[in-house]
């Protein structure tokens, strides 16, 4: 298993079996589609994220690009194991706050106010916690800030999702997955990760 650590990532609680991704990583997937998925009997869990990529920011006079990503209840719950310091609850419940993901050259700290440039408008977010890790990889030199959906909407004026992830019940069939695929707008990317996940499961367990 130690050798496999270098070649495969063990499944995390947030590992998706299906993903629906908007074109050009924009915020384009309507929230009603997520609600429809949640009501599907073969869907165990469905959750969305909104992304704003490489947003210009200034903190304490230092310029830096950041990715701003929204979490909902389940994703905040999973993040508890990765909290280095600060408060998840504040980021979850207080609009205008967020969590910074740790990086070695981190110039953004708890207590800092980050000024974001969103389409020429200046918006502020206060950092209330630090995470050791998150499921996403930002470009080199780009920071990652996690916030609530309410904060994301306030800062960006976007209310649709960039990606929706789906975890299925154990009795879901290929036919069920095909039916979900048929629900997805043809402009969106539909990603089926079940085969890769099952091979990882087989290696570890």
What is the role of each PLM region?
Residues 2-204:
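Basic-flanked hydrophobic alpha-helices used for secretion and membrane insertion
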């Amino acid at each position: 298993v130690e050798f496999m650590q270098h070649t495969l990532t063990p499944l995390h609680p947030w590992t998706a079996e299906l993903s629906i991704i908007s074109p050009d990583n924009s915020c384009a997937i309507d929230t009603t589609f997520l609600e429809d998925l949640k009501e599907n009997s073969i869907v165990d869990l469905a959750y969305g994220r909104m992304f704003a990529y490489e947003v210009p920011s200034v903190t304490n006079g230092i310029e830096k690009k950041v990715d701003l990503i929204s979490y909902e209840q389940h994703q905040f719950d999973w993040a508890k194991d990765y909290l280095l310091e600060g408060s998840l609850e504040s980021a979850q419940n207080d609009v205008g706050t967020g969590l910074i993901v740790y990086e070695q050259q981190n110039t953004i700290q708890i207590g800092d106010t980050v000024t974001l440039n969103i389409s020429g408008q200046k918006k502020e977010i206060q950092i209330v916690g630090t995470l050791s890790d998150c499921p996403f990889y930002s470009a080199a030199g780009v920071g990652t800030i996690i916030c609530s959906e309410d904060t994301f909407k306030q800062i960006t004026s976007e209310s649709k999702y960039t990606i929706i992830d789906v975890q299925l019940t154990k009795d879901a069939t290929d036919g069920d997955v095909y039916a979900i695929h048929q629900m997805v707008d043809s402009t969106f990317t539909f990603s089926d990760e079940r085969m890769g996940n099952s091979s990882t499961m087989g290696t570890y367990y």
